[in-house]
Amino acid sequence: MTISIVTGGAGFIGSHIVEKLKRLDHMVVVIDNEYSDNDNFHWRKDTLNVNIDITDYKALKKAFTGADYIFHCAAEARIGPAIENPVNALNINTIGTCNVLQCAREVGAKKVLYSSTSSGYGLNEAPLSLIHI
């Protein structure tokens, strides 16, 4: 059976990825720390739900053991908390992502899918063309 891990898998985007993976008969491990006060968490009874912060390297590596695929959706995506505590946002979004990539490499995961942000595109002139996409 294919084992897929979804970091941030109890959040909005991650939970939809989990739903699709379950329909594809993957064994899914959801990693989330339930930190965000504003999100509705979507823990499922048919997944292994692990409460881990992606900045905890040792715990993350243990949870990744045996994984075929990693879907990385965990992040501090909200603007308010990032402005209030930029060091924490940087730690989660940068060090946490480095931990995800390093653990995936060390356990021999086949692929990592990284869900970034629309902010990565920057400001573009309207209308958009295929060059901007």
Where are the regions that the model predicts?
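N-terminal Rossmann-like NAD(P)+-binding domain of SDR-like oxidoreductases, especially those catalyzing
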Residues: 1-130
